[in-house]
Amino acid sequence: DPALARRLTNVQAQANVPITGLTPLTAIDLVGRLRGGRPRQTRRRAEELIEALDLGEWATTPAQKISGGVARLTAFAMCAVVPGRLVILDEPTNDVDPVRRRLLWDQIRLLADAGSAVLLVTHNVREAERAVDRLTILDHGHVIAEGTPAALVAGHGSSFVLEISRTPGRRIEPPAGMSLTQHDAARASVAVDSHRTTQAVEWAAHALRDGAIERYELAPISLEDVYVDLTGSTGEEVRRHAA
């Protein structure tokens, strides 16, 4: 039933919503009223979203003069002002600066906590890991993994990853039994089991003193690492999709 779907569902498309002739505040308020919100409550909610997403500077700026990031945040707020039982967000963080991306993820989490089912599509795996309850990883349209972030990370073969910035022109060999993955000319990583972290750090510290690498960082395996291993995408490709 298309009419029922429209009542129960809010959608933020990947392409920005054309709101030429309106301001962000007016557009958010107008959509809230079209969704059945009471005028006074809708206006208050629109103003709350403007403040929560740090859009006050552009609240009354004509849409044709705002940036792509502000337009993206406005489109999200138009979905969130009077949310339905299902909220669908397609790449909601595209074009959004790092500071406001954090604010946006907070608002997405609040939508879910308030009772809406939130279905979101994103390549920003590292940020999504902190906000989602469950996820499905797709590769060329096929489901290759699904579950909670913790379960997917726990199912990974290694517990830690050693990120390395290589010195140009220098060759490095990881400790025996550890495999090095080259991401680009300067960056590589080594998967490390929990019982070999000391050995991995000692090896990296020696390589740093020897000038073979410029820096290193040992961190727990992230959902992004799982995504890269499952899909075969490089970390740089993941970051490029998320930019």
Model-predicted regions and their roles:
Residues Q107-D193:
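ABC transporter nucleotide-binding domain
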Residues P62-I66:
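Conserved ABC ATPase signature
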Residues F76:
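Hydrophobic anchor residue at the start of the ABC signature
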Residues P98-R100:
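Helix N-cap at the start of a conserved alpha-helix in ABC-type nucleotide-binding domains
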Residues V87-E91:
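Catalytic Walker B motif of ABC-type/P-loop ATPase nucleotide-binding domains
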Residues D29, R33, Q41-W58:
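Conserved ABC ATPase "signature" region
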Residues H195-A243:
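C-terminal coupling/interaction segments
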